[in-house]
A protein has these predicted regions:
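Acidic Gly/Asp/Thr-rich repetitive segments characteristic of extracellular carbohydrate-active
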Residues: 26-49, 54
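Extracellular beta-strand-rich solenoid/capping regions of secreted or surface-exposed proteins
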Residues: 54-68, 75-118, 126-136
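Acidic/polar low-complexity surface segments
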Residues: 150-153
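Short domain-boundary/entry signatures in modular proteins, especially
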Residues: 24-29, 72, 76-77
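Gram-positive cell-envelope targeting signals
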Residues: 1-27
């Protein structure tokens, strides 16, 4: 019986270590389901490899972990909600959406770990732009980014 418990614990430890490597690696995505899976697995780096990806969004894609989304020169139609002290960098491509804020930044309760959005080398076309909620600590950095939106909040 002890041998069985020990094997079970070793298997759990092995799976935990394996999950660390899976979430740490950069993931290339070509399809919507791969993108959803990368977000669900809280990947630290997501690289869009499809020329145009249109996410089916009834709601915003919630990001509550640190990640870098590299559009790799491609276009993504999606909206994001960044919250709980997450740090998200979106770079190197185009974001496009209508009718919703393309990115909603929700504040963190922790002054030491604000919710952070970094935009680099992007073109953003959106009807409502970026919305920053004043419900906590936030930080937004914008570098070499063109935004065309009807409104900013």
């Amino acid at each position: 019986m002890r041998l069985g418990k020990m094997c079970g614990l070793l298997m759990k430890a092995f799976l935990a270590v394996l999950m660390l490597f899976v979430t740490a690696a950069a993931v290339e995505v070509y399809w919507e389901d791969e993108f959803d899976e990368a977000i669900a697995n809280q990947c630290e780096s997501i690289i869009l490899k499809e020329e145009y990806l249109n996410m089916d969004f009834g709601e915003a894609i919630v990001v509550d972990f640190d990640t870098v989304l590299d559009l790799d020169g491609h276009e993504l139609t999606a909206c994001f909600k960044i919250k709980d002290g997450a740090k998200m960098t979106i770079k190197n491509g185009m974001l496009n959406i209508s009718a919703y804020p393309i990115i909603e930044v929700c504040g963190s309760d922790d002054e030491e770990r604000p919710t952070v959005l970094i935009l680099e080398n992007l073109k953003i076309e959106a009807s409502r732009g970026i919305q920053i909620n004043n419900d906590g600590y936030t930080r937004v950095e914008v570098n070499n980014t063109e935004m065309q939106a009807l409104s900013y909040h």
